[in-house]
Amino acid sequence: MKAIIQPDKTSHALILTQKPIPIPAHPQDVLVRVHATAPCKGELDWALYAPEYILPSKIPIPGQDLAGSVLSAPEGSKFKIGDSVYARIEANRPGAGAEYALPRESELALKPKNLSWIETAATPLSSLTAYQALFTQGNLCVAALAGDQVAKNTNASLRVLVTSASSSVGSWVIQLAREAGVGGIIGVTSTKNIGFIRSLGATEIIDYMDQDISDWVAYDQSREVDLIIDTIGGPSLAYSWHAVREGGNIISVCGFPEQSRPEGVTKKANSSFYLVNPKGTDLDSITHLIEADRVKPIVDSVVEFDDFAKAWEKVEAGHTRGKVVVKISGEM
Protein backbone atom coordinates (compact mmCIF):
# COMPACT_ATOMS: atom_id res chain seq x y z
CA MET A 1 0.00 0.00 0.00
CA LYS A 2 1.02 3.64 -0.44
CA ALA A 3 1.87 5.21 2.90
CA ILE A 4 3.22 8.51 4.22
CA ILE A 5 6.25 7.90 6.43
CA GLN A 6 8.33 10.12 8.72
CA PRO A 7 11.76 8.42 8.37
CA ASP A 8 13.55 10.58 10.95
CA LYS A 9 11.84 11.71 14.15
CA THR A 10 14.20 14.70 14.36
CA SER A 11 12.94 16.03 11.03
CA HIS A 12 9.51 17.00 9.71
CA ALA A 13 10.41 15.65 6.27
CA LEU A 14 7.88 13.08 5.04
CA ILE A 15 8.04 10.62 2.15
CA LEU A 16 5.48 8.59 0.22
CA THR A 17 6.52 4.96 0.00
CA GLN A 18 5.22 1.39 -0.12
CA LYS A 19 4.38 -0.55 3.04
CA PRO A 20 2.65 -3.91 3.58
CA ILE A 21 -1.09 -3.77 4.18
CA PRO A 22 -1.47 -4.08 7.97
CA ILE A 23 -2.69 -7.41 9.32
CA PRO A 24 -5.09 -7.38 12.30
CA ALA A 25 -3.29 -8.73 15.37
CA HIS A 26 -5.16 -7.20 18.31
CA PRO A 27 -8.62 -8.57 19.28
CA GLN A 28 -10.13 -5.14 18.53
CA ASP A 29 -8.31 -4.45 15.24
CA VAL A 30 -10.58 -3.37 12.39
CA LEU A 31 -9.05 -3.18 8.90
CA VAL A 32 -10.20 -0.02 7.15
CA ARG A 33 -9.66 1.31 3.65
CA VAL A 34 -8.77 4.94 4.21
CA HIS A 35 -10.54 7.61 2.16
CA ALA A 36 -9.18 10.69 3.93
CA THR A 37 -7.06 11.77 6.89
CA ALA A 38 -6.08 15.05 8.55
CA PRO A 39 -2.76 16.25 10.02
CA CYS A 40 -2.48 17.44 13.60
CA LYS A 41 -0.18 20.31 14.51
CA GLY A 42 2.78 19.00 16.50
CA GLU A 43 2.34 15.31 15.69
CA LEU A 44 5.67 15.13 13.85
CA ASP A 45 7.41 15.95 17.15
CA TRP A 46 5.66 13.40 19.34
CA ALA A 47 8.17 10.59 18.84
CA LEU A 48 11.04 12.96 19.64
CA TYR A 49 9.60 14.61 22.74
CA ALA A 50 7.45 11.79 24.13
CA PRO A 51 9.57 8.65 23.58
CA GLU A 52 7.97 6.98 26.60
CA TYR A 53 4.63 7.13 24.77
CA ILE A 54 5.61 6.90 21.09
CA LEU A 55 7.83 3.82 21.10
CA PRO A 56 10.51 3.19 18.44
CA SER A 57 8.53 0.14 17.32
CA LYS A 58 5.71 2.34 15.96
CA ILE A 59 5.59 2.43 12.16
CA PRO A 60 5.84 6.23 11.72
CA ILE A 61 2.70 6.82 9.65
CA PRO A 62 1.15 10.16 10.69
CA GLY A 63 -2.45 11.30 10.39
CA GLN A 64 -4.34 9.88 13.36
CA ASP A 65 -7.72 11.13 12.04
CA LEU A 66 -9.44 8.48 9.93
CA ALA A 67 -12.41 8.32 7.57
CA GLY A 68 -12.89 5.10 5.63
CA SER A 69 -14.69 1.82 4.91
CA VAL A 70 -14.48 -1.39 6.93
CA LEU A 71 -12.79 -4.30 5.13
CA SER A 72 -12.67 -6.73 8.06
CA ALA A 73 -13.76 -6.73 11.69
CA PRO A 74 -13.37 -9.07 14.70
CA GLU A 75 -15.93 -11.79 15.23
CA GLY A 76 -18.92 -10.38 17.08
CA SER A 77 -18.00 -6.79 16.24
CA LYS A 78 -20.75 -4.18 15.98
CA PHE A 79 -19.08 -3.07 12.74
CA LYS A 80 -19.48 -5.03 9.53
CA ILE A 81 -17.74 -5.14 6.16
CA GLY A 82 -18.68 -2.11 4.10
CA ASP A 83 -19.56 0.15 7.03
CA SER A 84 -18.53 3.79 6.63
CA VAL A 85 -16.63 4.75 9.78
CA TYR A 86 -14.42 7.37 11.35
CA ALA A 87 -12.03 7.46 14.29
CA ARG A 88 -9.17 9.06 16.10
CA ILE A 89 -6.42 6.41 16.18
CA GLU A 90 -4.37 6.39 19.39
CA ALA A 91 -1.16 8.33 18.77
CA ASN A 92 1.13 5.45 19.76
CA ARG A 93 -0.03 3.35 16.79
CA PRO A 94 0.34 3.90 13.02
CA GLY A 95 -1.97 6.59 11.69
CA ALA A 96 -4.23 6.88 8.66
CA GLY A 97 -1.80 8.53 6.27
CA ALA A 98 -1.93 5.38 4.15
CA GLU A 99 -4.32 3.45 1.95
CA TYR A 100 -5.20 1.08 4.84
CA ALA A 101 -5.23 1.45 8.62
CA LEU A 102 -6.03 -0.54 11.78
CA PRO A 103 -8.18 1.45 14.19
CA ARG A 104 -9.50 -0.38 17.26
CA GLU A 105 -13.21 -1.08 17.57
CA SER A 106 -13.35 1.08 20.71
CA GLU A 107 -12.10 4.06 18.69
CA LEU A 108 -14.60 3.75 15.84
CA ALA A 109 -17.99 5.25 15.17
CA LEU A 110 -20.25 5.12 12.15
CA LYS A 111 -19.69 8.02 9.77
CA PRO A 112 -22.28 10.82 10.01
CA LYS A 113 -24.68 10.27 7.12
CA ASN A 114 -24.78 13.94 6.16
CA LEU A 115 -21.00 14.45 5.88
CA SER A 116 -18.66 13.85 2.96
CA TRP A 117 -15.50 11.81 3.49
CA ILE A 118 -13.53 15.07 3.58
CA GLU A 119 -15.75 16.56 6.28
CA THR A 120 -15.69 13.29 8.21
CA ALA A 121 -11.88 13.18 8.28
CA ALA A 122 -11.88 16.74 9.64
CA THR A 123 -13.99 15.71 12.64
CA PRO A 124 -12.53 13.10 15.06
CA LEU A 125 -9.60 14.72 16.90
CA SER A 126 -10.96 18.25 16.98
CA SER A 127 -14.49 17.35 18.05
CA LEU A 128 -13.34 14.81 20.65
CA THR A 129 -10.86 17.29 22.14
CA ALA A 130 -13.54 19.97 22.46
CA TYR A 131 -16.23 17.57 23.71
CA GLN A 132 -14.02 16.07 26.41
CA ALA A 133 -12.58 19.43 27.44
CA LEU A 134 -16.05 20.82 28.04
CA PHE A 135 -17.94 17.84 29.42
CA THR A 136 -15.35 15.38 30.80
CA GLN A 137 -12.52 17.59 31.99
CA GLY A 138 -14.62 20.72 32.35
CA ASN A 139 -17.66 21.54 34.42
CA LEU A 140 -20.41 21.72 31.80
CA CYS A 141 -23.49 19.51 32.10
CA VAL A 142 -23.51 17.17 29.08
CA ALA A 143 -27.20 16.35 29.59
CA ALA A 144 -27.99 19.76 28.13
CA LEU A 145 -27.06 18.43 24.69
CA ALA A 146 -29.99 16.01 24.95
CA GLY A 147 -32.39 18.77 25.97
CA ASP A 148 -32.33 18.43 29.76
CA GLN A 149 -33.68 21.78 30.95
CA VAL A 150 -32.06 21.66 34.39
CA ALA A 151 -28.68 21.07 32.75
CA LYS A 152 -29.33 23.89 30.28
CA ASN A 153 -30.19 26.26 33.12
CA THR A 154 -26.97 25.32 34.91
CA ASN A 155 -24.88 25.89 31.81
CA ALA A 156 -26.65 29.18 31.10
CA SER A 157 -25.11 30.62 34.26
CA LEU A 158 -21.57 29.85 33.08
CA ARG A 159 -19.01 31.73 31.01
CA VAL A 160 -16.54 29.83 28.82
CA LEU A 161 -13.48 31.25 27.04
CA VAL A 162 -11.54 29.48 24.29
CA THR A 163 -8.19 30.56 22.87
CA SER A 164 -7.46 30.24 19.14
CA ALA A 165 -11.20 30.17 18.57
CA SER A 166 -10.99 29.83 14.78
CA SER A 167 -8.81 26.73 15.00
CA SER A 168 -10.17 23.25 14.43
CA VAL A 169 -10.60 22.60 18.16
CA GLY A 170 -11.67 26.14 18.98
CA SER A 171 -14.49 26.11 16.44
CA TRP A 172 -15.83 22.90 17.99
CA VAL A 173 -15.63 24.33 21.52
CA ILE A 174 -17.78 27.28 20.48
CA GLN A 175 -20.38 25.15 18.71
CA LEU A 176 -20.66 22.58 21.50
CA ALA A 177 -20.84 25.26 24.18
CA ARG A 178 -23.60 26.95 22.19
CA GLU A 179 -25.56 23.70 21.90
CA ALA A 180 -25.10 23.06 25.63
CA GLY A 181 -26.73 26.41 26.41
CA VAL A 182 -23.69 28.18 27.82
CA GLY A 183 -24.59 31.76 28.71
CA GLY A 184 -21.32 33.45 27.78
CA ILE A 185 -19.02 32.12 25.04
CA ILE A 186 -15.86 34.16 24.57
CA GLY A 187 -13.61 33.50 21.59
CA VAL A 188 -10.04 34.76 21.24
CA THR A 189 -9.28 35.35 17.58
CA SER A 190 -7.84 37.75 15.00
CA THR A 191 -9.68 40.66 13.42
CA LYS A 192 -10.33 38.83 10.16
CA ASN A 193 -12.04 35.91 11.93
CA ILE A 194 -14.42 37.86 14.18
CA GLY A 195 -17.43 37.41 11.90
CA PHE A 196 -16.70 33.70 11.50
CA ILE A 197 -16.45 33.13 15.25
CA ARG A 198 -19.67 35.03 15.92
CA SER A 199 -21.44 32.93 13.28
CA LEU A 200 -20.50 29.79 15.24
CA GLY A 201 -22.04 31.11 18.43
CA ALA A 202 -19.51 33.28 20.26
CA THR A 203 -21.25 35.95 22.34
CA GLU A 204 -18.09 37.97 23.02
CA ILE A 205 -14.81 38.40 21.14
CA ILE A 206 -11.27 39.15 22.23
CA ASP A 207 -9.33 40.42 19.22
CA TYR A 208 -5.78 39.46 20.13
CA MET A 209 -4.46 41.91 17.55
CA ASP A 210 -5.96 44.70 19.67
CA GLN A 211 -5.57 43.40 23.24
CA ASP A 212 -4.53 40.29 25.12
CA ILE A 213 -6.71 38.34 27.53
CA SER A 214 -5.28 40.03 30.63
CA ASP A 215 -5.97 43.53 29.23
CA TRP A 216 -9.48 42.48 28.26
CA VAL A 217 -10.40 41.33 31.77
CA ALA A 218 -8.56 44.19 33.49
CA TYR A 219 -10.94 46.62 31.77
CA ASP A 220 -13.91 44.99 33.50
CA GLN A 221 -13.45 42.34 36.21
CA SER A 222 -17.02 41.13 35.66
CA ARG A 223 -15.67 39.57 32.46
CA GLU A 224 -14.02 36.77 34.46
CA VAL A 225 -14.99 33.30 33.27
CA ASP A 226 -15.78 29.93 34.83
CA LEU A 227 -13.96 27.74 32.31
CA ILE A 228 -11.06 28.38 29.95
CA ILE A 229 -10.16 25.95 27.17
CA ASP A 230 -6.62 26.67 25.99
CA THR A 231 -5.79 25.30 22.55
CA ILE A 232 -2.58 27.20 21.80
CA GLY A 233 -0.39 27.41 24.92
CA GLY A 234 2.34 30.05 25.24
CA PRO A 235 1.46 33.57 26.38
CA SER A 236 -2.28 32.94 25.94
CA LEU A 237 -2.15 30.23 28.59
CA ALA A 238 -0.37 32.58 30.99
CA TYR A 239 -2.84 35.41 30.32
CA SER A 240 -5.70 33.00 30.99
CA TRP A 241 -4.90 33.05 34.69
CA HIS A 242 -6.02 36.68 34.82
CA ALA A 243 -9.39 35.83 33.28
CA VAL A 244 -10.43 32.73 35.23
CA ARG A 245 -12.57 33.39 38.28
CA GLU A 246 -11.67 32.20 41.76
CA GLY A 247 -12.53 28.48 41.85
CA GLY A 248 -12.85 28.25 38.07
CA ASN A 249 -11.17 25.86 35.64
CA ILE A 250 -8.32 26.20 33.15
CA ILE A 251 -7.94 23.23 30.81
CA SER A 252 -5.14 23.10 28.26
CA VAL A 253 -4.31 20.65 25.50
CA CYS A 254 -0.91 22.30 25.04
CA GLY A 255 0.75 22.43 28.45
CA PHE A 256 0.36 22.41 32.23
CA PRO A 257 -1.44 25.64 33.21
CA GLU A 258 0.17 25.79 36.65
CA GLN A 259 3.59 26.06 35.01
CA SER A 260 2.37 29.16 33.17
CA ARG A 261 0.85 30.90 36.20
CA PRO A 262 2.15 34.52 36.19
CA GLU A 263 3.93 35.87 39.25
CA GLY A 264 1.55 37.66 41.56
CA VAL A 265 -1.53 35.70 40.51
CA THR A 266 -2.62 33.97 43.72
CA LYS A 267 -6.22 33.03 42.93
CA LYS A 268 -7.22 29.41 43.44
CA ALA A 269 -8.39 27.69 40.27
CA ASN A 270 -8.52 24.12 39.07
CA SER A 271 -6.12 23.51 36.20
CA SER A 272 -5.17 20.53 34.08
CA PHE A 273 -3.38 19.42 30.94
CA TYR A 274 -4.95 16.48 29.19
CA LEU A 275 -4.58 14.28 26.13
CA VAL A 276 -7.64 13.39 24.13
CA ASN A 277 -9.19 9.97 24.73
CA PRO A 278 -10.04 8.33 21.36
CA LYS A 279 -13.46 7.07 22.48
CA GLY A 280 -15.82 5.87 19.80
CA THR A 281 -18.76 6.31 22.17
CA ASP A 282 -18.01 10.03 22.43
CA LEU A 283 -17.87 10.17 18.64
CA ASP A 284 -21.32 8.54 18.62
CA SER A 285 -22.64 11.46 20.68
CA ILE A 286 -21.00 13.92 18.31
CA THR A 287 -22.48 12.08 15.31
CA HIS A 288 -26.00 12.57 16.69
CA LEU A 289 -25.40 16.33 16.88
CA ILE A 290 -23.94 16.43 13.37
CA GLU A 291 -26.81 14.45 11.84
CA ALA A 292 -29.26 16.81 13.52
CA ASP A 293 -27.45 19.72 11.79
CA ARG A 294 -26.59 21.25 15.16
CA VAL A 295 -22.80 21.25 14.71
CA LYS A 296 -20.41 20.83 11.79
CA PRO A 297 -16.70 20.39 11.06
CA ILE A 298 -14.81 23.28 9.53
CA VAL A 299 -12.54 22.37 6.61
CA ASP A 300 -9.75 24.83 5.86
CA SER A 301 -8.53 23.16 2.67
CA VAL A 302 -8.11 19.82 0.89
CA VAL A 303 -4.85 18.34 -0.41
CA GLU A 304 -4.38 15.42 -2.83
CA PHE A 305 -2.53 12.32 -1.60
CA ASP A 306 0.53 12.96 -3.76
CA ASP A 307 0.75 16.53 -2.41
CA PHE A 308 0.57 15.36 1.22
CA ALA A 309 3.61 17.38 2.34
CA LYS A 310 1.73 20.63 1.69
CA ALA A 311 -0.89 19.61 4.25
CA TRP A 312 1.58 19.12 7.10
CA GLU A 313 3.49 22.26 6.13
CA LYS A 314 0.31 24.33 6.25
CA VAL A 315 -0.78 22.90 9.60
CA GLU A 316 2.64 23.45 11.18
CA ALA A 317 2.70 27.04 9.90
CA GLY A 318 -0.50 27.75 11.86
CA HIS A 319 -3.33 30.22 11.28
CA THR A 320 -5.60 27.71 9.56
CA ARG A 321 -9.37 28.05 9.88
CA GLY A 322 -10.49 24.51 10.72
CA LYS A 323 -8.80 21.34 9.46
CA VAL A 324 -6.57 20.63 6.49
CA VAL A 325 -7.61 17.29 4.97
CA VAL A 326 -5.65 14.86 2.78
CA LYS A 327 -7.57 12.80 0.21
CA ILE A 328 -6.24 9.25 0.29
CA SER A 329 -8.61 7.42 -2.06
CA GLY A 330 -10.57 8.60 -5.07
CA GLU A 331 -13.85 7.75 -3.32
CA MET A 332 -15.25 10.98 -1.98
Residue spans for each PLM region:
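Eukaryotic N-terminal low-complexity, Ser/Thr- and Lys/Arg-rich leader segments
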Residues: 1-18, 24, 78, 147-151, ...
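Glycine-rich beta-strand-centered segment in the early N-terminal region that forms part
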Residues: 20-39, 50-94, 107
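Conserved hydrophobic beta-strands of the Rossmann-like cofactor-binding core
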Residues: 85, 159-162, 228
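Short, glycine/polar-rich helix-capping loops at beta-to-alpha or helix-loop-helix junctions
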Residues: 96, 189-198, 258-262, 282-283
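Mid-domain Rossmann-like dinucleotide-binding core that forms the NAD(H)/NADP(H) cofactor-binding site
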Residues: 121-210
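Glycine-rich cofactor phosphate-binding loops and adjacent beta1-alpha1 units
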Residues: 149-157, 186, 199-273
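C-terminal hydrophobic helical "lid"/dimerization subdomain
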Residues: 280-332
